[in-house]
């Protein structure tokens, strides 16, 4: 059981890493990535943890950073569709499948 990333989610993560790297340094960017990986592994193990949303999706917040992971449960694991900032564009990534 594992997770896969929508190409848009890959870009969301890259954008967040660029932002934190430029504004706060590599250490903070690495902490963001570590926190994302922690949440992704947690959701693979317990896909029911996220708050139910639309289109069969679930949302789960990162603990330290103002981002939420939007994902869908699959038989083989989870598909991460969006990594969305919690204070910007509440419908961001909504059209992704």
Language model: regions and residue ranges:
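Short hydrophobic/aromatic beta-strand element in the GNAT-like acyltransferase core
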Residues: 57-59, 68-69
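Basic, Lys/Arg-enriched alpha-helical interface segments
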Residues: 1-57, 74-77, 96-97
